[in-house]
Curated annotation (Swiss-Prot):
PANTHER family: DENSITY-REGULATED PROTEIN, DENSITY-REGULATED PROTEIN HOMOLOG
Gene: tma22
Location(s) in or outside the cell: Cytoplasm
Lineage, uppermost ranks: Eukaryota, Fungi, Dikarya, Ascomycota, Pezizomycotina
Family: Belongs to the DENR family.
Main location: cytoplasm
Protein name (database record): Translation machinery-associated protein 22
Species this chain originates from: Botryotinia fuckeliana (strain B05.10)
Record remark on domains: The SUI1 domain may be involved in RNA binding.
Gene Ontology process terms (BP): formation of translation preinitiation complex; nuclear-transcribed mRNA catabolic process, nonsense-mediated decay; ribosome disassembly; translation reinitiation
Amino acid sequence: MADVEESTAPAEIQSRHVVYCGVCSLPPEYCEYGGTVKKCQEWLEKKYPSMYERLWSEDALAAATSTLSVDAQKRAAKDATKKAAKAEALEAKQNETLASSKIRIKRVERNKRKYVTEVQGLEAFGLELKKVAKEFGSRFATGSSVTKVASGGQEITVQGDVSDDVREFLIKNYKNIPKKNIVLEEPKKKKAEPVEV
């Protein structure tokens, strides 16, 4: 047994570190297929400049399109401008929707002297309703739940008359919600009808 066989043990498998985009949560190589290419590029340039140079520099883009025919290059340029225009229009529409969205905080009488506070419109600002309901419950030491509304949306119902406190809590903890978009709706009191004697 002069020949000693060296057992080739497989090398230890190394895990790869994959960078995910902070905007669209895809790897940066796939950001071009999402709808937020501009934002993704800005994020990548700020966080990982070397990767940005590798993917989006003029040289990298020229190298990627150099293998295409002239017609294909024209189509690619046309598609890129179309996608950019579509993304800008979508972003403008989202900004307009956010600007016009209102958060309605209503105090509703449950029975005689008991009230609940209803909060509608939080989902327009990208907030997770269950998480916010849990924060309300712990902050105000009351029951808080997400309920479905007849119109098809959802609202947060908080036990007790805490409408002013909810407004202050939202302004303080969620800076992305403009103060003017939070509306307190007071229920109109019914006028007592005159009693005929």
